[in-house]
Amino acid sequence: MLSKYVYGLSLGHFVVDFSQGALAALLPLLIAQHHFNYAIAATLVFAMNLVSSIIQPLFGFLSDRFRTGWIIIPALLITGLGFGTLGWDNQYFLLITSCLVCGVGIAAYHPDAAKLVNGLADVNQGHAMSVFSFGGNLGFAGGPITVTLVANALGIYGVVLFILVGGGVALLLAHYFPAMRRQSAQHWQQKRQRESDSPVPVKDDWRHFAILACVLFGRSIIFYGLNTFLVLYWMHILKQSNTSGSLALSVLFIVGATGTIIGGHLVDHISAVKTIRFAFTIMPFLLLAFSLTKSVIVVSALLLPIGMLIFIPYSAIVLLGQRYLPNQMGLASGVTLGLAISIGGIATPFLGQVADATSLITVFFILTAVALIPMGAAYFITEPTIK
């Protein structure tokens, strides 16, 4: 039976990733309030995502060197404070500062929370990591809808409620943290005992970790490409409404969240490597079919398995990263949950330039080609031996 503490950590994951998804929906209100242009408004998203992605491996490194599990509690407080003040900041400098503060909280939460989940999981590591990931995916998907409803009801100042949400979840995890730490520490102590009894020392496998990063880079570009251009594709290529396109994007996220849970069970039953290979072997063919048709019915039908397959290998990738670097698990979590994800955000402007120069259809053909990278790399990774 899965530890109840995993669900608590998943709730915290929901809170920190909620802010990333909600910021994009907050931009139109900030533009109207401060008379920003699109470029200036976009720098707010860039600032939050960049700082959270870049410094996440640093927090992972510190987690491996020191006992920093407690940092998940101030991380939630900082995230809530940063996002909750966005509606009240009256200067661009203050808005950027709030986004940076929020980004630091996001970066601080992921590595130690992922390590705790691994320690609490015992034998059901895939299921535990999928529950943890589900919380983050649900937060990312639910953020735009929730913040829009709050802003419509209370105005942009209503986002201050997020400070209370972050504080409430922080208090909940603070209450359970001593028990979580004891249970997780017991797991790692038993693991170290098994390793000390083994004549072969446990070494970090950097070569396979680098190959795994290539898998994640490809997934990140596909995810951000769909996240950025799906609504536009729905409007300009399929000739549907903006509302219809937004609904399609919501369906992608909802199906994806379900895929996260399915992926966790697959990891426990068929292994992480086979789960990754299964998803990325099929992915290029679905994206190619998506790019070749202009039928709304066919594209809508293809969207379901595409959304599922993007998220099915997510937990497997995070777990495999930790297994490849057993002596650097915090760093591994920081890279797989942070730095590697930012690659997709960096690639998105280049895809936008391609769309301007050619068409949105070309962008989806490029995403199809990109899908060949994780497909090929998946067959060069192996399942590490777990002692």
What does each of the following model-derived ranges do?
Residues 98-135:
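Cytoplasmic helix-loop-helix junction between adjacent transmembrane helices
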Residues 21, 49-57, 140-141, 253-261, ...:
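Residue-level signature of mid-helix packing/kink "hotspots" within the transmembrane helices
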Residues 54-90:
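Conserved MFS/SLC helix-loop-helix module at the cytosolic interface between two early adjacent transmembrane helices
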